[in-house]
């Protein structure tokens, strides 16, 4: 057989030559990230080293199983990567066991469910409209279909987590699993109180710290341990790693169940290039400068919230302990969907979000969710975030006065100022 079947450019041809159409999309996305202010609370900007690991030859390797116990040969080097990720995760969070194979935070949660409960069991989680996550028992999600999902919320008077309601619901419904955490919670959670409630009814306490894991790792947020039986997280967001998930515990029996639940329970071969990138990110998070970064993340979120309130908006709980600022737009008489689009045209990226007891549909909303991680990674500090808050107020005021179709002048003015600020804080100069 001759070598005519070989693609001569397979190992050498650049993406720009190989697939100009896709290369164009990637180039445009790089431009968007460089030129726009990213305020989506669940997003961040990874290091060049994380991207290099994720784009490495480890993408070629199948590695079903766990380090030292694989179902494929040739895993000696991917074992090094996974062991690095595991040991660094354990060091970051002060726990005894870590599974770094979940492909996402949702799959990490599914792994916990597979390990600890069975279909039809009762779970107790925060409702989506109070700031919870889809995977905590929301009706459209698998967690809401497979389990008897009971939902708790926040207090109407201050929008803080209603621990008395959690306790009452736990005593009434006797859940097997109680979930603490969410996707739009600006305040810290009292894990000790949640464990006390779990112990009252013999439930597992599962902390989903996907949003605030970076704060925990830096020692700037209470740790779920020793209170949680098990904790899950994403590895992006405030941890500033690749998109992925992770499960942590101090209980060896739970760890064994979790490992079996992830593989062979809900996943096959892990994504070794992503696990390699997780190891890099965890190593970065162990450095002293990461603590400084997280301190700035929190300070920036608080500066953003304070300035928005001064400008006539409200923020849920009137502030934040974390990186999340949940903005109530009702004082200005505008909706979340229109505000998201208007800010997007001004090159400030955020997402519409419901606020507690929101009268609007989820596709409309009365709020927007903002976050400080990505801007802080760029180098923004309080001064920049106060300026960003002023721009948000300017766009929102224009939207209220002019409507969606006549706010172009305001949006264009802010867009030019955004471009000037982003130029002072460049990202990825070598791309």
UniProtKB/Swiss-Prot annotation:
Catalytic activity as recorded in UniProt: (6R)-5,10-methylene-5,6,7,8-tetrahydrofolate + glycine + H2O = (6S)-5,6,7,8-tetrahydrofolate + L-serine
Modified residues (N6-(pyridoxal phosphate)lysine): 237
Keywords from the UniProt entry: Amino-acid biosynthesis, Cytoplasm, One-carbon metabolism, Pyridoxal phosphate, Transferase
Cofactor(s) this protein cannot do without: pyridoxal 5'-phosphate
InterPro entries in the cross-refs: PyrdxlP-dep_Trfase (IPR015424), PyrdxlP-dep_Trfase_major (IPR015421), PyrdxlP-dep_Trfase_small (IPR015422), Ser_HO-MeTrfase (IPR001085), Ser_HO-MeTrfase-like (IPR049943), Ser_HO-MeTrfase_PLP_BS (IPR019798), SHMT-like_dom (IPR039429)
First-level EC class: transferase
Pfam families documented for this protein: SHMT
GO biological process terms, semicolon-separated: glycine biosynthetic process from serine; tetrahydrofolate interconversion
GO-annotated molecular function: glycine hydroxymethyltransferase activity; pyridoxal phosphate binding
Site feature Plays an important role in substrate specificity, where: 236
Pathway named in the protein's UniProt entry: One-carbon metabolism; tetrahydrofolate interconversion; Amino-acid biosynthesis; glycine biosynthesis; glycine from L-serine: step 1/1
The EC number(s) this enzyme carries: 2.1.2.1
Compartments where found: Cytoplasm
Entry's Gene Ontology cellular component terms: cytosol
Recorded superkingdom: Bacteria
Residues annotated for (6S)-5,6,7,8-tetrahydrofolate binding in this entry: 128, 132-134
Family: Belongs to the SHMT family.
Self-association and partners: Homodimer.
HAMAP family the record matches: SHMT
Annotated function: Catalyzes the reversible interconversion of serine and glycine with tetrahydrofolate (THF) serving as the one-carbon carrier. This reaction serves as the major source of one-carbon groups required for the biosynthesis of purines, thymidylate, methionine, and other important biomolecules. Also exhibits THF-independent aldolase activity toward beta-hydroxyamino acids, producing glycine and aldehydes, via a retro-aldol mechanism.
Name of the protein described by the UniProt record: Serine hydroxymethyltransferase
Organism (species): Ruegeria pomeroyi (strain ATCC 700808 / DSM 15171 / DSS-3) (Silicibacter pomeroyi)
Gene: glyA1
